[in-house]
């Protein structure tokens, strides 16, 4: 059958590939999460401390007696499963090897969970590399809602793959998969896959995130900044406050992840586009000439996809110089910035396409990479 509208294709594709559609005889359901996080970045020591409140809705027909969290930073050390996998591969990932084997104790990544409760009751948990298994104080019945509260400390790894500090272009912090993250549960059960440098799958929900760090830093992130008048840095008309630190407050709805990047040397361009979408470009001054046309290209890319796959469903899109190549996250992408202009155009167009596939689609990238790549 010939479909004239790409929007119809996207709709049908989503219906045919959602977990609910594959679960014969079961009604459609998805788990839902609502994160509230308050974190402080200790820039000089490359560490972070934070608190997380997670409202978890069990919309499945199953009673849950355990939950699982991903602790992605634990992958970045010479003894992790990701390191071991690459140690024995005939064709190891050149972005990981040999760097991961040379990480010193102050360069590795880790998460330490200092407390975890369910509706106020302390919980026991075990950590296996990048996965934390939690025994619940009481089961979560179908339709049940619980609140998990957590305190954690983390060391931000030297950038090896996607996330970390001090990437090869001198960006201080590329913060992807940076928080203890609830694994997804669907009709196939828990997807608590160990992290070996591959892809992601998570439940949709909301994020309310406060990040405190030195006032010289400029942040690009998922979501909308809630306090631009307190921040400046191009988000508001105010000058950068003369304080030691600033707390940035972001909110995002109907997303399955939250990422951010921070550097004291970012330039920040803001472009207002069609359909009330705001575009943010963050890059360092030494690549400004290469980024000159990005203020034209980025809105054109999103508008192109919007005409073909359905309107871009979020209020903003951020392109930020960070990471180790190109990687998509809700409402933003991290890309290397010191490449030729046509390279910037190509990688941005590719990553922007992920705002629909897998961003809106929400497919399991780990199992079904063909759906979005």
Which residues does each PLM region occupy?
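Catalytic Zn2+-binding segment of zinc metalloproteases
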Residues: 355-368
């Amino acid at each position: 059958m010939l479909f004239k509208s790409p929007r119809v294709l996207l709709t049908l594709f989503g219906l045919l590939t959602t977990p609910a559609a594959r679960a014969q005889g079961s009604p459609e359901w998805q788990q839902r999460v609502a994160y509230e996080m308050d974190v402080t970045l200790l820039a000089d020591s490359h560490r972070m401390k934070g608190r997380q409140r997670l409202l978890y809705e069990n919309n499945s027909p199953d009673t849950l007696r355990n939950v699982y969290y991903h602790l992605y930073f634990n992958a970045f050390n010479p003894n992790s499963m990701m390191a071991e996998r690459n140690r024995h591969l005939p064709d190891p990932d050149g972005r990981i090897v040999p760097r991961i084997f040379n990480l010193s104790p102050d360069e590795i990544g880790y998460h330490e969970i200092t407390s975890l409760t369910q509706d106020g009751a302390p919980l026991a948990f075990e950590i296996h590399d990048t996965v934390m298994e939690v025994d619940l104080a009481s089961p979560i019945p179908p339709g049940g809602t619980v609140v998990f509260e957590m305190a954690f400390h983390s060391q931000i790894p030297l950038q090896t793959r996607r996330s970390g500090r001090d990437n090869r272009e001198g960006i201080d912090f590329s913060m992807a998969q940076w928080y203890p993250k609830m694994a997804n549960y669907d009709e196939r059960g828990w997807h608590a896959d160990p992290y070996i440098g591959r892809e992601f799958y998570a439940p949709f929900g909301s994020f309310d995130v406060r990040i405190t760090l030195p006032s010289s830093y400029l942040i690009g992130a998922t979501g909308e900044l809630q306090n631009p008048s307190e921040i400046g840095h191009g988000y508001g008309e105010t000058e950068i406050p003369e304080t030691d630190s600033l707390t940035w407050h972001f909110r995002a709805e109907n997303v399955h992840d939250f990422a951010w990047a921070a550097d004291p040397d970012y330039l920040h361009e803001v472009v207002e586009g069609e359909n009330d979408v705001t575009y943010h470009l963050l890059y360092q001054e030494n690549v400004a000439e290469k980024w000159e046309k990005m203020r034209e290209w980025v809105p054109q890319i999103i508008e192109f996809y919007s005409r073909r796959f359905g309107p871009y469903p979020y209020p903003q899109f951020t392109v930020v110089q960070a990471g180790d190549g190109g990687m998509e996250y809700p409402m933003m992408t991290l890309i290397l910035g010191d490449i030729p202009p046509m390279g910037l155009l190509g990688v941005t167009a590719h990553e922007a396409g992920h705002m629909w596939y897998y961003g809106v689609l929400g497919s399991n990238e780990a199992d079904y990479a063909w759906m979005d790549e």
